[in-house]
Amino acid sequence: VDWQGKHVTVAGLGVSGVPAARALHERGALVTVVNDGDDERTRAQAAELEALGVTVRLGDGATLPPSTELVVTAPGWQPDKPLFLAAAEAGVPVWGDVELAWRLRGDDGRKPAPWLAVTGTNGKTTTVRMLASILRAAGLRTEAVGNIGVSLLDAVVGETEYDVLAVELSSYQLHWAPSLRAHSAAVLNLAPDHLDWHGSMEAYAADKGRVYEGNTVACVYNVADPATEDLVREADVEEGCRAIGFTLGAPGPSQLGVVDGILVDRAFVADRHKQAQELAEVSDVDPPAPHNIANALAAAALARAFGVQPAAVRDGLRAFRPDAHRIEHVADLDEVRYVDDSKATNTHATEASLAAYDSIVWIAGGLAKGATFDELVIGAAKRLRG
């Protein structure tokens, strides 16, 4: 893309909008930032960009500025916003921050780092951080980026060089990323979430499935969640790209799984019909709850797709420590264990959390986001106390 003099509207300030506006301005684009909010924080961000020569319009994110040739949006902006409807009517393309990062790869002459991408309703952050830990254990220069930690755009255009990136992608980000082509990608699971944003479960799943499009080496799916394998079947991938499953049971050919407390690989071995490679022990996973073992298997599959040796998988999992609020052990008092899993913000994540324990007093709250809870409560009824 020749950015010089190109009129670009960036929709939204914040962790994605500010880096996008800065990167585009540095490449000669004529950037206008629009933002719905107008508060102290956004005014400070606006002042920072205006000092560079970027036009910022606060309190009005609905109107498409004249002469706009491209819109780059923050991932949370819904597709039915008036700004995007006006862009569609005018024939103006809309990209997300991930699409922009993908398009800017290598534009400084450096060899772009391949992306190992992870999406799913739950487990994305943990899996990406596990993957980054494994890649580091293999001696690779990497970072956990995307919807986590370091901005993906900053990782792509910044001075630090990487061998590979572990990329967390939300359904919002994938919706606006039509050109993304990962080295390998995983969809961990699919359950109703963000239906207020996507409009339907079908639209939500379709956006998740975009992560497989154009994959070159492996599409990793959850054997226990057939909807993820369906997305692999529907994807248009490069010749030779393989479907790789992960399961908490004994793996079949082209799968990773668990046998007698050992994480094993029957996908990336010389004879997957007769051989299995030991990767790590279940006890190497922290915490060793079933859903977290599944996360570890998905991370291992992506790492193995990138050529990482088994010892690095083991060492990376041993080095990994989970973030706060993810089945976090808080205290033991009067023979009761207190656990913080407040990152479980939908029914699927909550179901996985409750399944990790036999007897539970469950304290819950938050927004439903279009979901219902009857099946969750019925399924967990035997475990619930109090």
Predicted regions mapped to residue ranges:
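Nucleotide phosphate-binding/pyrophosphate-handling subdomain across enzymes
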Residues: D2-H7, G17-R27, L279-L384
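Alpha-helical segments flanking ligand/cofactor-binding loops in enzyme cores
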Residues: R22, A47, L85, S133, ...
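Residue-level signal for inorganic ion chemistry
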Residues: G12, L24, V71, V118, ...
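Beta-strand->loop->alpha-helix junctions that form or flank phosphate-binding loops
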Residues: N35, L58-D60, W95-L100, E143-G146, ...
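Conserved beta-strand positions in the Rossmann-like core of class I SAM-dependent methyltransferases
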Residues: T32, E143, V361
